[in-house]
């Protein structure tokens, strides 16, 4: 069963078994504008929760993408390098940034639910 959670840094995490898929939220891509470049983390890299591990550049700004959880990157979405505009079109589906195995499954449960994330957005 897959479940999606969110960070206050506007990343989403979809957990499927032991694998977490990470991307940026629709809110984040909308704030960035047209995405023109994406830099992804290397496979095999260990990241800590809150660590900047990817970069997304738009016509407006460049922004770090933070690891919402600690773990090891197992795959990066190379399609984003060829077509960074996917981030705008499919932010919370096909335009995932990387997949990782988690150091601590319980940390996933501490992230925001969809309802909690929407409530957080309302405070911005």
From Swiss-Prot:
<dbReference type="GO" id="GO:0005829">
    <property type="term" value="C:cytosol"/>
</dbReference>
<dbReference type="InterPro" id="IPR017453">
    <property type="entry name" value="GCV_H_sub"/>
</dbReference>
<keyword id="KW-0450">Lipoyl</keyword>
<dbReference type="InterPro" id="IPR000089">
    <property type="entry name" value="Biotin_lipoyl"/>
</dbReference>
<dbReference type="InterPro" id="IPR033753">
    <property type="entry name" value="GCV_H/Fam206"/>
</dbReference>
<dbReference type="InterPro" id="IPR011053">
    <property type="entry name" value="Single_hybrid_motif"/>
</dbReference>
<dbReference type="GO" id="GO:0005960">
    <property type="term" value="C:glycine cleavage complex"/>
</dbReference>
<comment type="subunit">
    <text>The glycine cleavage system is composed of four proteins: P, T, L and H.</text>
</comment>
<dbReference type="GO" id="GO:0019464">
    <property type="term" value="P:glycine decarboxylation via glycine cleavage system"/>
</dbReference>
<protein>
    <recommendedName>
        <fullName>Glycine cleavage system H protein</fullName>
    </recommendedName>
</protein>
<dbReference type="Pfam" id="PF01597">
    <property type="entry name" value="GCV_H"/>
</dbReference>
<feature type="domain" description="Lipoyl-binding">
    <location>
        <begin position="19"/>
        <end position="101"/>
    </location>
</feature>
<dbReference type="InterPro" id="IPR003016">
    <property type="entry name" value="2-oxoA_DH_lipoyl-BS"/>
</dbReference>
<feature type="modified residue" description="N6-lipoyllysine">
    <location>
        <position position="60"/>
    </location>
</feature>
<comment type="function">
    <text>The glycine cleavage system catalyzes the degradation of glycine. The H protein shuttles the methylamine group of glycine from the P protein to the T protein.</text>
</comment>
<comment type="similarity">
    <text>Belongs to the GcvH family.</text>
</comment>
<dbReference type="InterPro" id="IPR002930">
    <property type="entry name" value="GCV_H"/>
</dbReference>
